């Protein structure tokens, strides 16, 4: 991978108010660009807002569509890669919790959440593919919130060549400190066991549908070390420089990079 500056956003989304959320994104994208960021990651469903109520379907849009066009124009003008969450509706009427990858050259990619938490299963359809994306000299995967609790997904992405995994969340309830303790039970292990960077961020504040989100953003190194974190109930931007030498230091060490010594012929997950 190449050295890269990443921005992760603690962001307040109002459920169903797409225009308001997009306008707020513009502000932070411009700040990120001025700070030298190459990629900015927003939380899960930050554009449409998060809700496990069926009314959230009213905010669903196709991909590509008007939202992706707006973001493509913004990505091109600011010369920054944008990762952002949307309720997506396909041509068969299926509803997905999706995360967009918008590049300045016009590329529009999409990751559809694979593992749907029980309270969301009446609304969202699970995705069925595990895409990886290339941007600014790095290869990365995306997982959305509940996805991160399935460790084999991170290992799959690492084996397929991911240097980092973005894990946007829309995870309500609790304080930022409580959410941080919860994330540290598994996110550091995803980074350490697979020798890659993890970038995780959450929504914050009230969403106008009865949910409150504890603001948190964490960037974790391939040794499982915390590179940077912010806990805040206000919108905040977390910036970090991810260095190829930190990744190489782990992956070239025979006792710190575990994946080459896997025994997949012994594992039966069926």
Give the role of each language-model region:
Residues 90-167, 172-185, 249-258, 266:
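Active-site catalytic loop in hydrolytic enzyme cores
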Residues 20-29, 150-155:
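Short, acidic/polar
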Residues 10-16:
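Short polar catalytic/cofactor-binding loops
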Residues 48, 100, 111-117, 218, ...:
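Short beta->alpha transition motifs characteristic of CBS
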Residues 18, 27-104, 172-189, 193-196:
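Cys-nucleophile CN-hydrolase/nitrilase-fold catalytic domain and related Cys-dependent amidase chemistry
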Residues 66-83, 149-237:
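CN hydrolase (nitrilase-like) catalytic-core segments centered on the catalytic cysteine
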Residues 101-103, 220-221, 240-241:
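Short beta-strand-to-turn element immediately C-terminal to the catalytic PLP-Schiff-base lysine
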Residues 2-8:
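Extreme N-terminal starter segment of soluble prokaryotic enzymes
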């Amino acid at each position: 991978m190449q050295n890269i500056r990443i921005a992760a956003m603690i962001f307040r989304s109002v459920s169903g108010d797409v225009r308001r959320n997009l306008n707020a994104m513009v502000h932070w994208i411009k700040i990120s660009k001025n700070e030298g960021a190459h990629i900015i990651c927003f939380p899960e469903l930050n554009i449409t807002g998060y809700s496990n109520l069926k009314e959230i379907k009213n905010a669903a849009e196709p991909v590509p569509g008007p939202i992706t066009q707006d973001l493509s124009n913004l990505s091109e003008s600011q010369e920054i890669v944008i990762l952002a969450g949307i309720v997506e509706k396909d041509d068969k009427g299926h509803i997905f919790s999706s995360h967009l990858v918008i590049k300045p050259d016009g590329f529009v990619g999409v990751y559809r959440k694979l593992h749907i938490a029980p309270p969301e299963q009446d609304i969202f359809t699970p995705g069925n593919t595990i895409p990886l994306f290339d941007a600014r000299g790095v290869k990365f995967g995306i997982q959305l919130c509940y996805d991160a609790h399935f460790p084999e997904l991170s290992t799959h992405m690492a084996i397929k060549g991911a240097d980092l995994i973005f894990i946007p969340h829309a995870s309500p309830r609790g304080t930022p400190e409580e959410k941080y303790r919860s994330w540290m039970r598994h996110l550091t292990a995803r980074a350490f066991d697979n020798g890659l960077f993890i970038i995780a961020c959450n929504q914050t504040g009230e969403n106008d549908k009865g949910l409150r989100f504890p603001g948190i953003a964490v960037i974790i190194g391939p040794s499982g070390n915390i590179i940077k974190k912010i806990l805040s109930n206000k919108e905040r931007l977390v910036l970090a420089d991810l260095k190829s030498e930190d990744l190489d230091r782990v992956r070239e060490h025979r006792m710190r990079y575990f994946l080459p010594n896997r025994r997949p012929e012994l594992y039966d997950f069926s």
